[in-house]
């Protein structure tokens, strides 16, 4: 298994290959989408053992740390694969890649115990270098969802960056917002100030305006998968701390397959 000190070195190298909020669109044949792993290094290793070899691209949707005690090693494992082939691995940012959550859900304590508190600065630098989003095969991939003032995908490329918390409202909402059936527009979320639920009408408008098929995201605890807003939004959850299944989504040409681990 990747050691903590090795992770410290890997994230420094990986950071230099990131550094912009929106990645270039990708068109590939076989894609593996991985949701929140939250320190579940066993799930991450299974993804690489079972699916990586046949894939053209693996997209991680954020939330690698917190809610467990192997977040450092989980980050290191993914970063090591990313450095082997940066064109085959995408590491998107989640809301738990932030000092807004790490002091409360375990990652700051984990880093302090394994590497010393001062080393957390390097993880913060890594987190703020992570991209928010990428369009893959005409699906918008990100952690949370669309934002109240986001009209086009191209706006993401112009967001303030790096933005550690993030403080920009759009950047924050990309990581924190959730889809909800039976609502219209945007409604304040129980997650707190600045976070919103988005409904089917604004989602359909955004997808149509940007010629997108749908949204693939993480962020919510589900039993592997959930489809919302008439299937336009797919949520993937790839950890097992909640006692349910970990899911990965495979997009192979026009065929979409949900696999529970």
Which residues does each predicted region cover?
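Feature recognizes metal-dependent phosphohydrolase scaffolds
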Residues: 1-261
């Amino acid at each position: 298994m990747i050691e903590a000190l090795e992770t410290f070195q890997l994230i420094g190298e990986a950071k230099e290959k990131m550094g912009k909020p929106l990645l270039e669109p990708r068109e590939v044949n076989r894609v593996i989408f991985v949701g929140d792993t939250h320190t579940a290094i066993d799930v991450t290793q299974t993804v690489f053992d079972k699916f990586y070899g046949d894939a053209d691209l693996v997209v991680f949707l954020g939330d690698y740390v917190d809610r467990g005690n192997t977040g450092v090693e989980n980050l290191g494992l993914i970063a090591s694969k990313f450095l082997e082939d940066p064109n085959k691995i995408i590491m998107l940012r989640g809301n738990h890649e932030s000092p807004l959550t790490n002091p409360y859900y375990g990652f700051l304590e984990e880093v302090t115990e394994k590497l010393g508190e001062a080393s957390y600065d390097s993880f913060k630098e890594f987190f703020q270098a992570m991209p928010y989003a990428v369009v893959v095969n005409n699906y918008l991939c990100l952690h949370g969802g669309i934002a109240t003032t986001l009209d086009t995908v191209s706006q993401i490329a112009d967001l303030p960056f790096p933005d550690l918390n993030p403080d920009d409202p759009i950047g924050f909402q990309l990581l924190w917002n959730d889809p909800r059936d039976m609502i219209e527009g945007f409604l304040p979320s129980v997650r707190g100030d600045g976070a919103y639920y988005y409904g089917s009408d604004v989602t359909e408008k955004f997808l149509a305006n940007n010629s997108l098929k749908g949204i693939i995201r993480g962020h919510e605890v589900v039993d592997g998968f959930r489809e919302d807003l008439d299937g336009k939004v797919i949520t993937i959850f790839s950890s097992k701390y909640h006692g349910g299944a970990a899911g990965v989504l495979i997009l192979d040409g026009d065929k979409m397959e949900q696999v529970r681990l």
